[in-house]
Amino acid sequence: MTPSNRGTLARTAMAYVLAGGRGSRLYELTDPRAKPAVYFGGKTRIIDFALSNAINSGIRRIGVATQYKAHSLIRHLQRGWNFMRPERNESFDILPASQRVSETQWYDGTADAVYQNGDIIADYAPEYMVILAGDHVYKMDYELMLQQHVNQNADVTVGVLEVPQREASGFGVMHVDANDRIITFLEKPDDPPGIPGAPHLSLASMGIYVFRTTYLFELLRADAADPHSSHDFGKDIIPTVVRHGKAIAHRFSTSCVRSQDESLAYWRDVGTIDAYWEANIDLTTVTPQLDLFDKDWPIWTYSELTAPAKFVHNEEGRRGHALNSLVSGGCIVSGSYLHKSLLFTGVRVHSYSHLEGAVVQPYVDIGRAARLRNVVVDRGVRIPAGLVVGEDPVLDARRFRRSARGTVLITQPMIDRL
């Protein structure tokens, strides 16, 4: 599928990305950065997917609201997303919490993160607002969602997908009628309702919403004046529209961008160490579920100027090679072996090392004869020579962050304590 050329609706819309979340279930991986700024896929950040979807859909006005530990994210956005040009009626605004409405508070909920920047949005006068979460990995044509919103004369259109019922308690869950009008909406229920006829599945919100701008700000002004509101889209705004307006569900399967090799609608919340590791390692398969080589729907990002990846030494026991792996620019694999692993920019793997199922973030240095299995290594970590991880669960859990499913997170403070 090629990016939208129609632009009729996308050009009248503004994409507003909520990128202030911490992502606490990623533990130490988000200590220095917000979840949307976490590295993914070898050279991108998680937020690049929502932003690329907006660009590829034809949207040319974008705002990004930041809050938690935003420096890494803001620096990435400044370097990689500064190509929008006002003279072409384009804009890209980074919107950190700046107490524009109240002098005593930062963003107090997702709805407040939009409300506080109402004057900036009003200057651009978009007809529609596409509210996006900045911490999910997927490819989607928002133009198609905008079309449904207009065609069904909706007050809000909510992006939805089917998820296993046992996993749905982390989402907004809804019931819809035969025309996909939302009848009930529950935010993160303890016992999520199943889909009629398929009780093992629930219809879950993707955190993607389309509103007509004037109507959205009517809702936001009323919400801001409500002292009992949590100022959250899922908890307050969407349930209000379900009760008093027309809320429509937009099924992700109808607007998911698939390449020829993709058969299923791909969407991931990489919010746990296991989910993050699995989504990255899946990219090393022959036919991954997510196609990053799709030239028709590119994932835009900031790309550092680096030398090509380099593999050196070719002798028995000291042969630099990789199998079923992704190796980014600036990496040097020196007499070591990689299998089903992913190296981000500038990683150095010294001789006699063995990596299996390793997700290694930028500028990591892996010492000689290290053995790493099923690991996530944070940016800039220096792995000492001879370190073995992934072979002794008890030792791994004592020294590092080990998940119940066996993924081991390694950060520099953990190494320093060895």
From Swiss-Prot:
Its EC number is 2.7.7.27. GO terms for biological process: glycogen biosynthetic process. CDD domains: ADP_Glucose_PP, LbH_G1P_AT_C. It holds the Pfam family Hexapep_GlmU. This is Glucose-1-phosphate adenylyltransferase. Keywords: ATP-binding, Carbohydrate metabolism, Glycogen biosynthesis, Glycogen metabolism, Nucleotide-binding, Nucleotidyltransferase, Transferase. GO terms for molecular function: ATP binding; glucose-1-phosphate adenylyltransferase activity. The keyword Ribonucleoprotein does not apply. It comes from Gemmatimonas aurantiaca (strain DSM 14586 / JCM 11422 / NBRC 100505 / T-27). It catalyses: alpha-D-glucose 1-phosphate + ATP + H(+) = ADP-alpha-D-glucose + diphosphate. The keyword ATP-binding applies. Alpha-D-glucose 1-phosphate binds at Y107, G172, E187, K188, S205. Gene3D superfamilies: Hexapeptide repeat proteins (2.160.10.10), Spore Coat Polysaccharide Biosynthesis Protein SpsA, Chain A (3.90.550.10). Involved in the biosynthesis of ADP-glucose, a building block required for the elongation reactions to produce glycogen. Catalyzes the reaction between ATP and alpha-D-glucose 1-phosphate (G1P) to produce pyrophosphate and ADP-Glc.
